[in-house]
Amino acid sequence: MKAVVLAVAALFLAGGEARHFWQRDEPQASPWDKIKEFTTQYVDSVKDSGSEYLKQFETSALGTQMNLKLTENLDTLSSTFSKLREQLGPVTQEFWQNLEKDTEWLRQEMNKDLADMKQKVQPYMEQFQKTWQEEVERYRQKVEPLSTELREGARQKLQELQEKLAPLGADLRDSARVHVDALRTQLAPYSEQMRERLAERLAALRDSPSLAEYQAKAHEHLKTLHEKAQPALSDLGQGVLPVLESLKATLVGAIEEASKKLSSQ
């Protein structure tokens, strides 16, 4: 199971490199940076929207009577969560950095395979693009006189024009289907070859002597992450507990006061 997880992680990293290779984009942020950025944005969004509703409730008649201090409690929880995120950040980032380092050879091999595949496939893609442009130009030349006829003709000729365009559109679709099928047939051997190479790379990764060593490292990282998370989670629980107790006591007091008023009537 650990080997499967490691292989998926390696494919994730190698896949990111392959995407940059084909798109020629600048490398993006690390997975941990993306997770951290998303979490920060989500928590800030929830905090901002939640604070607005809590302030409205606190200023209401019921909120003033109950004196819940929800905004203050929300700030306390936000501070505790930020502390937890800061404690877990270095450990998780170190795990991703080690994973990228240990799978560097796999990414290099995959990039070589992709470069070789791109070189072989490029002529077919260029020919497909050239043929398709010729088909579109041929279609445009046939349609242009009909468009002129439409502009110069009356409305009663619209139906006739549509009838003339229908077979041309069908012809273009049929031509496109033929070219796509031909391209698919030409690329099929390369797709199969790429799948075989990927299987070989994964087999080499699975049989690598360093796999057991890396599994031990991953286990140690997870153990360290768990140990460092425990105090922060404990602090989070301690921060939430007073809020719940305060809310419970306030609600109980409000219920008792309401019961006394009903009894005295």
Curated annotation (Swiss-Prot):
Primary localization class, coarse: secreted
Keyword Repeat: yes
GO MF term (any one): cholesterol transfer activity
One protein family per Pfam: Apolipoprotein
GO BP, sorted A to Z: acylglycerol homeostasis; cholesterol efflux; cholesterol metabolic process; lipoprotein metabolic process; phospholipid efflux
Sequence repeat intervals: 68-89, 90-111, 112-122, 123-144, 145-166, 167-188, 189-208, 209-230, 231-241, 242-265
UniProt region (10 X approximate tandem repeats), positions on chain: 68-265
Compartments (UniProt record): Secreted
Modification after translation (UniProt): Glycosylated.
Annotated GO CC locations: chylomicron; extracellular vesicle; high-density lipoprotein particle; low-density lipoprotein particle; very-low-density lipoprotein particle
Methionine sulfoxide found at: 110, 194
Domain of life where this protein originates: Eukaryota
Keywords linked to the UniProt accession: Cholesterol metabolism, Glycoprotein, HDL, Lipid metabolism, Lipid transport, Lipoprotein, Oxidation, Palmitate, Phosphoprotein, Repeat, Secreted, Signal, Steroid metabolism, Sterol metabolism, Transport
Leader sequence residues: 1-18
Record's subunit section: Homodimer. Interacts with APOA1BP and CLU. Component of a sperm activating protein complex (SPAP), consisting of APOA1, an immunoglobulin heavy chain, an immunoglobulin light chain and albumin. Interacts with NDRG1. Interacts with SCGB3A2. Interacts with NAXE and YJEFN3.
Function according to Swiss-Prot or TrEMBL: Participates in the reverse transport of cholesterol from tissues to the liver for excretion by promoting cholesterol efflux from tissues and by acting as a cofactor for the lecithin cholesterol acyltransferase (LCAT). As part of the SPAP complex, activates spermatozoa motility.
Family listed: Belongs to the apolipoprotein A1/A4/E family.
PANTHER family reported for this sequence: APOLIPOPROTEIN, APOLIPOPROTEIN A-I
Protein name: Apolipoprotein A-I
Organism the protein comes from: Dipodomys ordii (Ord's kangaroo rat)
